[in-house]
């Protein structure tokens, strides 16, 4: 039974044609406190049609309404407050969660439609810093949420694997590098060579000419240049993979910038054939005045193509390859103008599918309110932060539960999960402060708090040492349980909303609220008391664990059974 629909049916039964059922459903509210009921309907909208005061309308409707199936229905000023039948509600929600288990909350909103997600996208030969965390974990969580509601996400790591920097890198490697060093520690040493190049070219500007020459060779397909480029790329990817493995993130495609080298001329020709290219100071542009945007730069004065041309090629390739229903770019907010231009140029070219391209921007990670950039003159490496988080989690587990089996594995799940959860609990567009000790705390609004709550539920089930019987009447008659039950019933709507808003924080905040409600219930209930309610109480505990584990999984966070 859909309990909100029960309210809609009761209202439409007395409203007749005054208000369509869809509008009634939109107007129904959830009261802030349970003493005002479980659902409320404001009658203001009916005052004009019925020519009565809202208070009178509320009372008249209640007097005429069929209230069977509700505990009670009352007029409260201009509102009608609905109190659900707690026994029926409890039984149905718990049976649904226990029966559907990990599938609870699934839907077919997406009808299997393809959704490419451009995410993470680090630069080859440069380290993955804390700056890459957001795009990676937001993209991964959105993919999981979209899968849950019936879409088919395609996670694309659009690598920064092309550009003039590779000419510089080849020169630097040939002058100062060695194969052994690169194999031993690819990112550190390739970055070291690149930095040395920039230090040396101050005194030796001829290095820039050499770099340009090597990049031209690379563009022309020269064997040595291509072999070195390919090697730098594969060695970097091996290092990146270590971090992706730590985060539990996988990709469906690593097609980066280089993949589109042979696809850009066709884009320029297509723009030209539509009569959209204009010359401006020797460069070629598309005028976007009609969209209130700056012109899109397609070719530089030296004939070189730009990011915009490459991104146009990528967008068109993804449409042709995946026939997408949506195409997402999980990229920082500073790129907003670029993606507006991208969509506008595609639209001007006659591609109406550009309406389904969505830039998913996000805010910055800060430390002490300042942009997270460098520590002692270098970038803050994501791998170091994750390792530090694991150590902190391990120390807390050691103090709380020194005999825990698989302590090292649990420390990884908790430490890395804490970093991911902290990122995702914040509204995507907000900047947020990062303090590792706060992030890995077991109390407060943290990932470890949610994980610990789930481990507590699992511990209760182990102590009970009995199978939950789903066929019983699962009625938990307890005020503290009521808040938990209502929250469990909201989970499918939470997932649907998160999918529509591309907003993992909706799921993370829900998990925190459910954990808090369950801990209140735990503190005030004798769950393991041997009475006729024991099976129902254990079914509630098991349902909470199922939903917490599902919510954590949607965020890309693991849920250890013991902590």
Curated annotation (Swiss-Prot):
Coiled-coil ranges (or none): none
Recorded GO CC terms: cytoplasm
Subcellular location(s) of the protein: Cytoplasm
Family to which this protein belongs: Belongs to the class-I aminoacyl-tRNA synthetase family.
Motif ('HIGH' region): 122-132
Assembly and binders: Monomer.
InterPro entries, per the entry: Arg-tRNA-ligase (IPR001278), Arg-tRNA-synth_N (IPR005148), Arg-tRNA-synth_N_sf (IPR036695), ArgRS_core (IPR035684), DALR_anticod-bd (IPR008909), Rossmann-like_a/b/a_fold (IPR014729), tRNAsynth_Ia_anticodon-bd (IPR009080)
Chief place of localization: cytoplasm
Pfam families registered for this protein in UniProt: Arg_tRNA_synt_N, DALR_1, tRNA-synt_1d
GO biological process: arginyl-tRNA aminoacylation
Enzyme Commission numbers on file: 6.1.1.19
Reactions catalysed: tRNA(Arg) + L-arginine + ATP = L-arginyl-tRNA(Arg) + AMP + diphosphate
Catalytic EC class: ligase
The name this protein goes by in its record: Arginine--tRNA ligase
Transmembrane segment boundaries: none
Organism of this sequence: Latilactobacillus sakei subsp. sakei (strain 23K) (Lactobacillus sakei subsp. sakei)
Gene3D superfamilies named in the record: Arginyl tRNA synthetase N-terminal domain, HUPs, Isoleucyl-tRNA Synthetase, Domain 1
């Amino acid at each position: 039974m859909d309990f909100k629909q029960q309210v809609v049916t009761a209202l439409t039964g007395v409203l007749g044609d005054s208000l369509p059922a869809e509008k009634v459903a939109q107007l129904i509210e959830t009261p802030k406190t349970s003493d005002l009921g479980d659902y409320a309907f404001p009658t203001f909208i009916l005052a004009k049609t019925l020519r009565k005061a809202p208070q009178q309308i509320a009372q008249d409707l209640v007097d005429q309404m069929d209230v069977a199936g509700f505990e009670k229905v009352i007029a409260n000023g201009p509102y009608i407050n609905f109190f659900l039948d707690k026994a029926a509600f409890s039984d149905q929600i718990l049976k649904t969660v226990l029966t559907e288990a990990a599938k609870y909350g699934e839907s077919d909103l997406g009808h299997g439609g393809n959704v490419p997600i451009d995410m993470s996208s680090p630069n080859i030969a440069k380290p993955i810093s804390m700056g890459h965390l957001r795009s990676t974990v937001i993209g991964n969580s959105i993919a999981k949420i979209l899968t849950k509601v019936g879409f088919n996400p395609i996670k694309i790591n659009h690598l920064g694997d092309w550009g003039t920097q590779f000419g510089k890198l080849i020169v630097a490697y040939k002058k100062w590098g060695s194969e052994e060093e690169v194999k031993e520690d690819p990112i550190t040493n390739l970055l070291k060579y690149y930095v040395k190049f920039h230090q040396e070219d101050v005194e030796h500007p001829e290095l820039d000419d050499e770099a340009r020459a090597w990049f031209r060779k690379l563009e022309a397909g020269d064997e040595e240049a291509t072999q070195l480029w390919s090697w730098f790329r594969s060695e970097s990817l091996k290092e990146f993979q270590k971090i992706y493995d730590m985060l539990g993130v996988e990709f469906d495609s690593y097609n980066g910038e280089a993949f589109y080298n042979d696809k850009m001329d066709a884009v320029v020709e297509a723009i030209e054939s539509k009569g959209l290219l204009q010359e401006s100071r020797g460069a070629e542009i598309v005028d976007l005045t009609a969209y209130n945007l700056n012109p899109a730069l397609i070719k530089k004065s030296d004939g070189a193509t730009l990011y915009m041309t490459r991104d146009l090629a990528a967008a068109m390739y993804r449409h042709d390859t995946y026939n997408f229903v949506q195409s997402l770019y999980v990229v920082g907010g500073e790129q907003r103008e670029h993606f507006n231009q991208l969509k506008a140029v595609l639209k001007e070219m006659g591609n109406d599918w550009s309406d389904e391209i969505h830039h998913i921007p996000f805010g910055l990670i800060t430390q002490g309110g300042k942009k997270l950039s460098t520590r002692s003159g270098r970038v803050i490496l994501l791998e170091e932060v994750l390792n530090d988080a694991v150590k902190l989690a391990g120390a807390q587990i050691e103090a709380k539960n020194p005999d825990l089996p698989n302590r090292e594995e649990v420390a990884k799940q908790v430490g890395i999960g804490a970093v991911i959860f902290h990122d995702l609990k914040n509204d995507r567009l907000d900047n947020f402060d990062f303090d590792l000790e706060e992030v890995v705390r077991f109390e407060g609004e943290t990932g470890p708090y949610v994980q610990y709550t789930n481990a507590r539920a699992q511990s209760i089930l182990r102590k009970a040492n009995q199978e939950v019987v789903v066929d019983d009447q699962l009625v938990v008659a307890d005020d503290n349980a009521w808040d938990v039950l209502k929250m469990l019933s909201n989970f499918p709507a939470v997932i649907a909303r998160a999918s529509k808003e591309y907003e993992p924080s909706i799921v993370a905040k829900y998990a925190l609220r459910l954990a808090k409600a369950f801990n209140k219930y735990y503190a005030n209930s004798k769950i393991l008391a041997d009475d006729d309610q024991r099976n129902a109480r254990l079914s509630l505990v098991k349902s909470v664990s199922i939903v917490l584990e599902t919510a954590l999984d949607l965020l890309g966070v693991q849920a250890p059974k013991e902590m």
